[in-house]
């Protein structure tokens, strides 16, 4: 079982903690989420600690990431989205660092677990819903009835739109977890074949593995971007009601 491609996703208790009858143990998932947060904070601290007129490469890379998120909000929401930059930026960076940290050998990918991605998705869902009610009050409920819908079709449209709205955190979380898990399983399986093929083909399979790892890094970045841009689109729906 130790060689199973799925063994890399096993959650292991490091510190057993019971609190008020609940199991809140510190696991390998917990430590990698904490490590991702520390690495992200360290990266931006070093990038902006001693800002210069002629920025360093580290500062430039950090500014590119920040501008990416700021542009994402501006394009999807407009000026009204600026106040959400800290939240959306933190979300993007956390997912990005968790995804990339999972690419290091013998590490653990926290975003491959639905409990982690669903928690992030439900936080986005609650934030979007609260923003909608705070900004529009009961008028927010018009989101579930598209403008111009015939009266006889209204009950059906409300049910469909409500179901679609409630399904958002599920689809958002499943997309991220499934893509990260599938990619790592594929990498593990092909890596096993590569070791066997090297007996006969020498070093020929190595470039294939390098290309595959490069593709997985691209997917890790892309999935963080998709999760974030969908969050921006959901925010736009409740801020700019149509």
Swiss-Prot record:
Example of a GO cellular component annotation carried by this entry: plasma membrane
SUPFAM superfamilies in the record: F1F0 ATP synthase subunit A
CDD domains membership: ATP-synt_Fo_a_6
Pfam families: ATP-synt_A (PF00119)
Topology versus the membrane: Multi-pass membrane protein
Keywords per UniProt: ATP synthesis, Cell membrane, CF(0), Hydrogen ion transport, Ion transport, Membrane, Transmembrane, Transmembrane helix, Transport
Localization: Cell membrane
PROSITE patterns: ATPASE_A
Chief location: membrane
InterPro entries in the cross-refs: ATP_synth_F0_asu, ATP_synth_F0_asu_AS, ATP_synth_F0_asu_bact/mt, F0_ATP_A_sf
Parts of the chain that traverse the membrane: 29-49, 84-104, 114-134, 140-160, 181-201, 203-223
Record flagged with keyword Transport: yes
Keyword Cell membrane carried by entry: yes
Chain's role: Key component of the proton channel; it plays a direct role in the translocation of protons across the membrane.
Protein family membership: Belongs to the ATPase A chain family.
Protein name as it appears in the record: ATP synthase subunit a
Gene (name only): atpB
């Amino acid at each position: 079982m130790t060689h199973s491609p799925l063994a890399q996703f096993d959650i292991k208790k490091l510190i057993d903690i019971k609190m008020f009858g609940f199991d809140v143990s510190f696991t390998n998932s917990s430590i990698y989420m904490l490590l991702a947060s520390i690495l992200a904070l360290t990266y931006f601290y070093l990038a902006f600690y001693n800002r210069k007129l002629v920025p360093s490469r580290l500062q430039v890379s950090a500014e590119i990431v920040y501008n990416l998120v700021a542009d994402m909000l501006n394009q999807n929401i407009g000026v009204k989205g600026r106040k959400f930059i800290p939240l959306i930026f933190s979300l993007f960076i956390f997912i990005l660092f968790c995804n990339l940290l999972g690419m290091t050998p013998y590490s653990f990918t926290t975003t491959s677990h639905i409990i982690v991605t669903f928690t992030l998705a439900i936080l986005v869902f609650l934030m979007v819903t609260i923003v909608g009610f705070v900004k529009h009050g009961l008028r927010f409920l018009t989101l579930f009835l598209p403008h111009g819908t015939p009266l006889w079709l209204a009950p059906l449209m409300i049910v469909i739109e409500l179901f679609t709205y409630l399904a958002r955190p599920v689809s958002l979380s499943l997309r991220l977890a499934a893509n990260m898990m599938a990619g790592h399983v594929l990498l593990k399986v092909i890596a096993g074949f590569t070791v066997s093929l090297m007996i006969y083909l020498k070093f020929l399979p190595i470039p294939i593995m390098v290309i595959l790892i490069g593709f997985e890094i691209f997917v890790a970045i892309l999935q963080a971007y998709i999760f974030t841009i969908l969050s921006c689109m959901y925010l736009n729906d409740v801020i700019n009601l149509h």
